[in-house]
Structures are given as structure tokens and as C-alpha cells.
């Protein structure tokens, strides 16, 4: 099964959707750097009853230093200035005045590079925000493509109301990214970009095919790279 990482997962809606897609196969690792939000994340995924799950409360950059090239797929719903949500929540306007796009841009650039580093060759990374700011959207994409030349943008299945990313005519193919505007389709403002890492397709890599008495390779690799002690009697395969 696939090994999937939800980097900025709280409160857990995306993680439960990913868990449903995995359908009790592979491994889902979810993380949030905020202690309080990680607790909410843990509570929500426990209610959902996800059996193949590990919840972390760590800095993504630190995780990347231990799990380089580990995940088949990475989801980054990045912390952002929230411009796309102003219509829904007026409190976000006050938050934007305190910490605007410039504040979040550096955070996003760090975590998008960390996400790429944790991705296997042939794996896919989805980067999203709920802001209109080019600084947080297309500029984050350019930062990744410039610093990780083994990453490239791929097309996202079009839907009515989707708009292309703001292209710069500099060869980055930013038109493959998607912008969602509330006056174009139902919902709030969002930005989405899908990347693929160069190299052998991860689906062709060797996977464990048998041995019910043994831990799946992807789970054992993860446990071997953590500092926690696990009670194997509580792990049911």
C-alpha cells in the first residue's frame, strides 16, 4: 500500500478523506506543528476509526531530515494569510493585518521544500492554500521548482469554474496550477498545485506481498526511524 503524509493536517478533515481513499491499506502519517491543533487532529481521526494511522506533532523540516524520500504522496495544505476566507470569517481580516502574506511566505517556502525532500521518486505532492496572494501561491511554486529541479508541475483534472494559475512566461508552466475564485464557482478562494518528482514510478517499486506475521515494510521503516518504543502486541496486521 501507499505511504501518504498529510503535513499540515489539523483539524483532520483532509486526513479522514485520505484514510477513506487508502481503505485500510498502506500507512497514513498526519502531522500538525501546533500542539493544541495536533490534539484536535488526534481526536478527530480516532473518532473516524482509522487503523493505519500515525499522528505527529513536529516541525515538518525536522521530519524531512529523518524521512528523506520516504512517502509516495505528500499533501501540504499550507498555513496562509487566509485571504480567500475573508467573506466567510471576518476575524481573518484582523489576523491578516497582524500577519500578512510576507509572514507566511517564508513558512510556506520552507515546508514545500521539506515536502519535496520527503517524496519518493515518481511520487506526487499537492500544495494548496486558501489565499489569493501570488506571494504565497505562484511564488511558492517557483521557489520549489527553482530549488528542486527534480520536481515538475503536472496537470490537474479541470472542472467548470477552475482558473489557471498566474503564469510568468518564464518556463515554469504555472498555468497548470489552479485558482478558485468565489465569483467563478461555489465556495471560497483557493490555490492548488500538483507536482511529480522525477524518477522511477513509485507504483513499480517493490512492495511487501505476503507474510501476515511480519510488519509491512513501510510501517517497519517508519517505526525504525522514530525514537518511540512500540508494543508490537497491540499492532494487528
Whereabouts are the PLM-identified features?
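S-adenosylmethionine
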Residues: 1-235
